[in-house]
Amino acid sequence: MLLPSFPVTGVATALLLRNAVHASQPGSSVQKARAYDRFSSRPTRDHAPRVQSSNTSTYRFWNDKTKPHLVESLPDVHFDLGEMYSGSINITSHRNESRSLFYIFQPKIGEPSDDLTIYLNGGPGCSSEQAFFQENGRFTWQPGTYAPVINQYSWVNLTNMLWVDQPVGTGYSVGTPTATNEAEVAADFLEFFSKFQDLYGIKNFRIFVSGESYAGRYVPYISSAMLDKNDTTHFNLSGKPAHPLHHLAPTNAVCTGALLYDACIGQWDWVQAELPAYPFVQQHASLFNFNETFMTSLATTYEECGYQAYFDEYFTFPASGIQPPKYMNYSECDIYNAIYNEAFSPNPCFNPYRVIDECPLLWDVLGFPTDLAYEPAPTTYFNRADVKRALHAPQNIEWELCSTDPVLVGGDGVSGPEQVGDDSPNPTEGSLPRVIEATNRVLIANGDWDYLIITNGTLLAIQNMTWHGQLGFAAAPATPIDIRMPDLQWAGVFDAQEGYGDLDGPQGVMGVQHYERGLMWAETFQAGHKQAQDQGRVSYRHLQWLLGEVDSL
């Protein structure tokens, strides 16, 4: 997540918003068996690296055209990658300058699938290699760990996966940024996606669009542009609801849809950050550990600047009415940045993406795991020449996790609702309702440890959105998300320690869900800005719902 619109002070805060977005005996064999029975599609549990055949004759998408894109191995990844492709695809040039978007494509493991799930990171300008390498790809290399390992909760266990560096100016993409709005971003993406499908011979697939953080703007606009094409051969996002409008309910029919994590969907700086900031600190008081004097000043600011009254009036179920527009207040009422700056006093390693974190900063192969860069450090993984060669990436690109230059250039990169050069209206004002109404299968989820995009702020944005003729949710979310899948990622660690072998059981209640009129809401416990990284089992369930494999979370 990037969104560098807040004025902040000091070296540490200069990087603000850079990367951007129970059973009674859970270890018993009976409980494990029951949990396994609940999942018809689940990761395969093994403790040694899984190895797929390197014989390309078994690869579904390998042909003479895709052969140059095949990834045979990656540095420091000491197991067979299976079928995997990456590279650049050209899009329309601008002023005689070539432009291209970079992608990584991992086909589904096991039984073939005609589902294709796109995943986009946010920023604007943050590379989707982040999600590929640390969130939902086939393997993962987490901060502070020695080497990459198989990701037991990888989304490639369920669907073909496509990660894309976009818009132009992001990651390994090539060209000078020209987009001033989401329509232009979507046009470039659809051109890329059409060429990608032609390259791999993909037709008549169900398409799912997902992403996190600022991709809360990308995903609805790209999805809406796909719907505009009215072309189910290449852009089958609309699906066919199995129920009449007045009986809408989740269904495993042919519906497709979209998934948004910790997403910028409303007026982010005010509704999803500034307004809910103080209640967030109250909820997590022991983590922030502010002194009594500072907490008293926050309470005074929250009331005197009108935040309390606004929140009380509009954070209601059902919605009390259309919320009047508000914008970031940089005066003495700037409560969000006051909290952000003060947080570094009790916790010098404060991480707004995951407020549970403390010092030391863990070395991250992607460069920095928080707002603070880790220095000195080795070359970032995706900036290594050998990694670029393996991925068929441009050698002359200086890869950055999040671009330091604008990738959206409206008003010289500072116009639009979020002041980042994106002139399009907020998704809640049109594109997001349109996708919900067309698919009846959209999931919006927020992690409870995320200070960048706060859970109740996202809910407040939903309460200001009209879809299927009604404003917001009629009832407050209250249904628990009970994860019965046993632990798969760390089971080997438990099993290797005497006396710990039965502790890798189901998680139990890991969040709250609510479904109305085609929209599923999920609050995820013990997760920050990157839910798939923090809570792989919960994220896996989210994807199962999106694909229609389960009716609830």
UniProtKB/Swiss-Prot annotation:
What protein name is recorded for this chain?
A: Serine-type carboxypeptidase acuI
Gene3D superfamilies under this entry?
alpha/beta hydrolase (3.40.50.1820)
Query: What function does this protein fulfil?
Result: Serine-type carboxypeptidase; part of the gene cluster that mediates the biosynthesis of aculins. The pathway begins with the synthesis of 6-methylsalicylic acid by the polyketide synthase (PKS) acuA via condensation of acetate and malonate units. The 6-methylsalicylic acid decarboxylase acuB then catalyzes the decarboxylation of 6-methylsalicylic acid to yield m-cresol (also known as 3-methylphenol). These first reactions occur in the cytosol.
EC number(s) recorded for this UniProt protein:
3.4.16.-
| Residues listed as glycosylation sites in the UniProt record | 55, 90, 96, 157, 230, 236, 291, 329, 456, 464
- InterPro entries, from UniProt? AB_hydrolase_fold, Peptidase_S10, Ser_caboxypep_ser_AS
Q: Which residues form the active site?
A: 213, 450, 529
Q: Which family does it belong to?
A: Belongs to the peptidase S10 family.
This protein's pathway: Secondary metabolite biosynthesis
Q: Which residues form the signal peptide?
A: 1-23
The terms under GO molecular function for this entry are: serine-type carboxypeptidase activity
Q: For the region Disordered, what residue ranges are annotated?
A: 27-55, 412-432
UniProt-listed GO biological process terms: proteolysis
Source taxon at top rank: Eukaryota
UniProt source species: Aspergillus aculeatus (strain ATCC 16872 / CBS 172.66 / WB 5094)
Which UniProt keyword terms apply here? Carboxypeptidase, Glycoprotein, Hydrolase, Protease, Signal
User: Which is a Pfam family this sequence falls into?
Assistant: Peptidase_S10
Q: Where is the composition biased (Basic and acidic residues)?
A: 34-49
